């Protein structure tokens, strides 16, 4: 830590030398855009997002990446809530640690790369492995909660409890829809991105060999 504190860092391409607090006070929306874009890139690659934007109406084109980022951000919050609500950490703390690790990685990338003042910097593919820990944690949380909901539904059927069953059933259905939607988005987005990367890999290898 002492050695690191004595180091002199040279950020090539940095466009500001003010502190992060000063920059946040000057343009707070930049940090929000940075986070939303980096969070969105954890389920769908940058090239795929750009492809979706290119074929969308102007309103969707302007806001698609932010809507995706917001959806993933809400899923992070939902996973944290479900870990506490169902006390999943008593059975296994692993999903919660993954969720926290993924979220902290987004904040670390922001803290390290805001100085370039490019809100798409956090979408770089080199950060994807760091982000995927959070996505895996969310999916594991959803899987555990889905299993817990099935167990409770079976208990309700067995006991034939009538009190507040419709409300609980509606809440469980809504929760399942949200979890299923995020799972489909994640699987589809990662499959699409991986397929494109596999197709691009030979050309990237040839380019690196020449250069």
Annotate each predicted stretch with a short phrase.
Residues 101-126, 139, 148, 152:
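Flexible internal linker/loop segments at domain or repeat junctions
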Residues 116-129, 171-211:
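Membrane-embedded, lumen/periplasm-facing catalytic core of multi-pass transferases
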Residues 1, 95, 146-191:
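Signature aromatic-anchored transmembrane alpha helix within multi-pass, membrane-resident enzymes
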Residues 82-92, 165-170:
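Membrane-interface helix-boundary motifs at transmembrane edges
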Residues 2-82, 117, 125, 132:
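Membrane-lumen/periplasm interface segments of multi-pass, membrane-embedded glycan/lipid transferases
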Residues 71, 97-108, 139-142, 181-188:
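Lipid-exposed faces of alpha-helical membrane segments in multi-pass integral membrane proteins
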Residues 76-79, 132-152:
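Transmembrane alpha-helices and membrane-interface helical segments
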Residues 1, 86-115:
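Transmembrane alpha-helix segments characteristic
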